[in-house]
């Protein structure tokens, strides 16, 4: 515990906040190219095959990004737009691919939450 005089002389050092999405370079989104598309199993209580892509961003960072939604058309060398946002049950996956932009198609026929999956408005009957 510092004395009052020590605090006057030196003050307290502020804690530095760490950036969770350092690969984005303070940008809201970044463009990248797929190096590999694969599946990964989640952490302990959950069970699935989550679709992920290894992406090289335009600033030369290599990251893993989650591909949301059912089905996708990504393959090697596809261009994708990446945003921040981790996947809680996949360690090391701290980014999401944005559907409906560049080479990653939106989900056809989706009616709810369309904006999150790049789906077009359905034709009214």
Curated annotation (Swiss-Prot):
The keyword Zinc does not apply. CDD domains: Ribosomal_S12. GO terms for biological process: translation. It is found in: Mitochondrion. Coiled coil: none annotated. GO terms for cellular component: mitochondrion; small ribosomal subunit. PROSITE patterns: RIBOSOMAL_S12. InterPro entries: NA-bd_OB-fold, Ribosomal_uS12, Ribosomal_uS12_bac. Keywords: Mitochondrion, Ribonucleoprotein, Ribosomal protein. One of its GO terms (molecular function) is structural constituent of ribosome. Its main location: mitochondrion. Belongs to the universal ribosomal protein uS12 family. Protein S12 is involved in the translation initiation step. PANTHER family: 30S RIBOSOMAL PROTEIN S12 FAMILY MEMBER. This is Small ribosomal subunit protein uS12m. It comes from Brassica napus (Rape).
